[in-house]
Structure formats: structure tokens, C-alpha cells
Amino acid sequence: MGAAIEEGRLRVDGVDVFYRRVPGEGTPTVYCHGNPTHGEDWLPFLERGGPALAIDMPGWGRSARPERFDYSMYGLSAFLERCLAELGVERRKLVVHDWGALALIAAQRRPELVERLVVIDSVPLLPGYRWHWVAQLWRRRGVGELLNATTTRSSLALLLRQARGDRSPMPPPFVDMIWDHWDAGTRRATLALYRDADPDRLAAAGLDLDRIGCPALVIWGDRDAYLPTRFARAYADALPAAELEILAGVGHWPWIDQPGVVDRVLGFLG
């Protein structure tokens, strides 16, 4: 039987925020999701015990989707920190995936608050990245709106095949987890975030990664269709105390292609 996962809500800056929490003793692990997923993405980790926390960021999952909200990189990063403060989280272990990398913006400013760090196939806050083709469409005004308006569950499932290491279909519950929350508000938030994220802004956001001196683990699938493995190496080079593991035949969500990744991450976190 898995750990008891508590569900809760809080209001931060007038925005309704949903979160999942697993109680326990010690430093909590904060799991930071990417796009187009949300906190449910982390259930395989949360079910193994706590203390742990996974927040649905505004615009995604079961949190609100306010029209007047700062969905920029720095806006979302700052909002996450306000959520953590509201929940009484200061020192933390940090696990980031995809756009969860935005948590590293605050970690560079307050590295003493991060006890351990795991970076999994994350958006590169590093020089030299160029967006994958879907993101390039999202970043084009009019084109991104058209793509989102014409997306169906079937086309989403087809697109997600490229996220698998062997390009096989994603498990239907995973597709449902995304599709059930892929509404107009999430689509709007997605476009706002990607359009804020010019490559030079990504690089500038990670200029002080070398300040994060805690033990770190970088895990990356060598078949990630969105984020080439050279950025795994670049993250490992930028973080002073990082280990690097590149997983053969694994895609963008390593714990789906290789469930043993959950054990590896939890073992590293201690």
C-alpha cells in the first residue's frame, strides 16, 4: 500500500492553488512539474512516502487559470516560492522535470535552502538551446492558438509517442491525465510561458547555477525528442556537486520508460 497522500488548497495572491502532500519527518521533497502535465505526474514518487509536496502551478492541473496572471518564467518561479512560504516550506530537497526547472531560478538566489537536487530532462536554463518543433509552433502568434484549438485527445496521444524512448504509445491513463485538464486556461498559460522563453532568456536565467552547491543528480533519457543529452552534460557541468546519469533507450519521462528511476531518485534523496 502506498503512502497516504493528502490533497489541499490554498490561496496565494488571490489565486486558488491545488497541492498534494505526504506528511513525514525531516526535510520535505518538493516535486516541480512541467508542461503539459501537473502534480499528478509525481504520484509514483509521492506514493513512496514523505515528507513530500507537489503543487499544481496556476494554469495547470487542478489549480486556477486566471486570465490576469504572470505566466512568465520569472512570474511562475516567484509564485512557486510564495506558495512554499505559505505552506511553511523553507529548506527543501528539490526534484524538477521539464518546466519544473523554473524552481532553479529561486534556488540560485537562495542555494542554502536546497539540501539536495534532482534534475530530470529539464528545460535548459543554459546557453545554446533551440526549441523543439511543437514549442516553435506555440511561440508563433496565431499558429499556437490554431494548434491548441485543433488538438484532440487522439492527436495529443500521437504527439506524446515521441516522448517515449521507443516511440510507443503513452499509457492511456497518462494521456487522460493531461487531456482531462487541457482546457482553454491551460492552453493560454502554455502559450504565455513559451512566448516568454526566448533562448537568451533561458540562458540568462541559469547564469548562477554554480551557486547551487548541494549534492545533485542529473538524470536524462538519451531518446528525449525535446531536450538533447548535451544539456544533461551542461547541467552536470554547471552544478558543482552533480552526478550525471544518461539512460539508454529512455525518453522525456524516464520514470515511465524505466520505473526503476523512482528508486534511483528516492535513494539519492535519502
Task: Give each language-model segment a name.
Residues 1-29, 49-50, 89-90, 263-270:
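Alpha/beta-hydrolase fold catalytic core
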Residues 116-146:
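Flexible "cap/lid" loop of the alpha/beta hydrolase fold
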Residues 212, 218-220:
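Short beta-strand/loop motif that positions the catalytic acidic residue
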Residues 21-62:
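Conserved HGGG/HGGXW glycine-rich cap/lid loop of the alpha/beta-hydrolase fold
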Residues 223-227:
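Acidic catalytic loop of the alpha/beta-hydrolase fold
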Residues 54-96:
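Active-site loop/oxyanion-hole signature of alpha/beta-hydrolase fold enzymes
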